[in-house]
Amino acid sequence: MHIYILGSAAGGGFPQWNCNCPNCHGVRTGTINAKVRTQSSIAISENGVDWILLNASPDIRQQLFDFKAAQPARKLRDTGITNVILMDSQLDHTTGLLTLREGCPINVWCTEMVYQDLTTGFPVFNMLKHWNGGLLYHQIDPKQAFKIDGFENLEFLPLIIQSAAPPYSPHRHDPHEGDNIALIIKDHKTQKQLFYAPGLGKIDDQIMQIMQDSDCVMIDGTLWTDDEMQQTGVGKKTGREMGHLYISGEGGSLSYLNQLSTPKKVLIHINNTNPILNEDSAQFAELKANDVEVAFDGMQIEL
């Protein structure tokens, strides 16, 4: 399984266009050791030619320009991407579908709850239905594994996780199963497994066992502390109120990752306020000392 990180930042990217927090100001002026990052999305493939997009970022055009393998150039109009899997209906995971409209029809895999949001509050399915066949909806049963034609060796097992629907969704304060999923992706040829959960509000015993059984875990790294948005003065909500588990301290994701012995451990969906973006920070050093990697745009993993 080939895994390519198209984007590794949380909503707004890094630097966020209107933000002057120490990180955004620092990377913009070149005064901190940090990489520019686009909003989170990854692509996976079993042959290096045909790819599945996991979430469609607002930055997808630039991401695909930088990702040369996504353009096999076999004909006048071509792409290596004809399938998109959505983990949720967040704007930073779905607005990229509008940019992909020239490639319609596109197969879009999502749960019924996500489909409801994307035909009402943010009706992207409706908006694109006249674009050469539009978006072709494939329902994900959050309790059943599925496969995608053309990717015979890859199996996808959804996992219902605790997080939050987007603010525009009627499910925001009325959670439903399927608002958010993680994916266990198994390559039956290599017998390797990826656990992908860019939006994760809680780690329980089931998730711990799944992570231990995986060869790579790529999970939510939005915030270093739960009150980070408040402490930096850019917001009033905690990480948990937004559906994101913080990294540090008791109960943080790092305390769980440190219990894992075998998998490659990667944090993705990093908010622009997170000190781990500064590669000279004590927080980045702490992750490195614990064999936890911070995803970056263009990062490649082979399983």
From Swiss-Prot:
User: What keywords is this UniProt entry annotated with?
Assistant: PQQ biosynthesis, Transport
Give the record's pathway: Cofactor biosynthesis; pyrroloquinoline quinone biosynthesis
Q: Name one GO biological process term.
A: pyrroloquinoline quinone biosynthetic process
Has keyword Transport? yes
Pfam families in UniProt: Lactamase_B_2 (PF12706)
Q: What does this protein do?
A: May be involved in the transport of PQQ or its precursor to the periplasm.
What family is this protein classified in?
Belongs to the PqqB family.
This one is known as Coenzyme PQQ synthesis protein B
| Organism the protein comes from | Acinetobacter baumannii (strain AB0057)
Organism ancestry: Bacteria, Pseudomonadati, Pseudomonadota, Gammaproteobacteria, Moraxellales
Q: Which gene encodes it?
A: pqqB
